[in-house]
Amino acid sequence: MNKEKISILITNFNKEKFIEECILSCLNQNYNNLEIIIVDNSSTDRSMSIIKKYSNKLFIVKKKRDSLWSPKNQIDSLIEAFKKSTGNLILLLDGDDYFLPNKVSHIKNIFLKNNNLDVVFDVPSILANNKFTRLKIKKKYNKNIWPTTIPTSGISFKRVFFENCLEFDLFDSYPTLEIDFRLNFFAQRIQRKFLIIKENLTIYRKVNDGIMSNVNFFSYNWWKKRLQAHYFIFDIYKENEIEYKKNYDFYLTKITFWLLNKIIK
């Protein structure tokens, strides 16, 4: 059971309060043959001094922040970690989240029992204000547009899936779009070899300095991100030769963003 090497890719930026718990959750897995790669994106806090305590058990990569956009920096860090990895099964983890001890073995068993799967999404528990709640999966009224978006730390996949993402230039444009949205969309709308499970395996920490924390609903940046998401979706459908027509949501978003630009100017 523990023969196959499995890679855990951790991305971190200024998570000194949480990064040790994140690392320990990987080291304390009940699956032994792990390759743990952590990319620190030029943290300015004590993150690196904490990470270095475990340098004999981790592969540590230091990376510059090359973009003004946090989502793009995280994407670049993840690509760097992927290039360093050697496992055929890969689990993602943000520096402020953590795994429960049986996560790796449970995910591996799911892939073993379902050989046709490329991606497994596990619905995480949310930790906010010292309280745990389960992430609610919302009903999608237009299933052809927005995927059910599981946070990054709940995404596990075969190596070939991410190689396909790179081949289709999934990460090259739209710097405000997070990695989890891109991976969820590609898996659920394009490749369709995925499974969403509700077992409690991952703790997703909701913090004030997270990538999405500063994007308030219906704010200027919210509409901007939504419009970029629409264009991203159209690009991917086109590249995969899938016919898709712009709908009312797209035009509402485009007009609203245009009006907001007029007001700001």
Predicted regions and their residues:
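A conserved acidic beta->alpha catalytic loop
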Residues: 40-49, 65, 94
